[in-house]
Amino acid sequence: MARTARVKKTGNGTSYYHIMSRANDRRFLFGKGRVKTQLVDALKRAAAFSGIELDAYVALDNHFHVVCKVVRTDEPVAEDELLRRVAILKGDRAAEELAAHWRELCEIGMEAAVAEEQGRLRARMNDISEFMKTFKELFNVWYKRERKYTGTIWSGRFNSTLIEGDRYRATCMRYVYLNPVRAGMVKRASDYAWSWIAAPDEPFAGSVPEWRLMRRVAQIGGGKIFGSEVFVVSMVFALGDRFRSRSVCARAVGELGYATHGWRLARAETAAQGPA
């Protein structure tokens, strides 16, 4: 079966995503606190390297969630910044060795080779797929060495949902943060050691009681686009070719108490059924 195209906003500007990835066969590979601590650390380091801003995250026993912000511009990442990010990801020594390597290449007239290497690094920035690839490579090395594990850690590709800003972003952030409460692991989200939520940029527009977010909402966790109908339609139009061969099903998210839509790729006969 052909893989479904990942929904990602292209071009310059700001976009937000909800990302979720599970352990292989839903096994409790991350059950120990030390493993979850390392998972969170790898998320932070991979995000800093990739230029991704974390809005919320939670590490659970067999999966994790992230809400993140991606800002894309025409301004290339400067060499000093590239080295700073490499230091975050791989350590100061690795960054120092890379800087020395680039200097040596420049001294023998191989500036083009330096530009090519830096270009490959820049291509890994500000992209959720590259962010997840960097994170999983980093975490996998530690996990397999620490746990003497030889099997597959992750269950296929990660799931991602493109989300609108403002209240939709805030809803996803709170939904992610409440995961340990929904799972019965703690009574208050703030008591869970492996989750975090950023303070909102501005007051939350349109209150959503937390008890509503205690219900699992498929459009947040499994949809492809989450936001107002205007946002969803505009994104579907902008993404164009990815949707022409498929139908798009709109489902109203009534549990959240205000008008919003979660859209996902669906079969034609499913799309004809209307809101669920």
Predicted feature residues:
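Short Pro-Cys-Gly-centered "Cys-loop" motif that presents a nucleophilic cysteine in a tight turn
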Residues: M1-D61, K69-A276
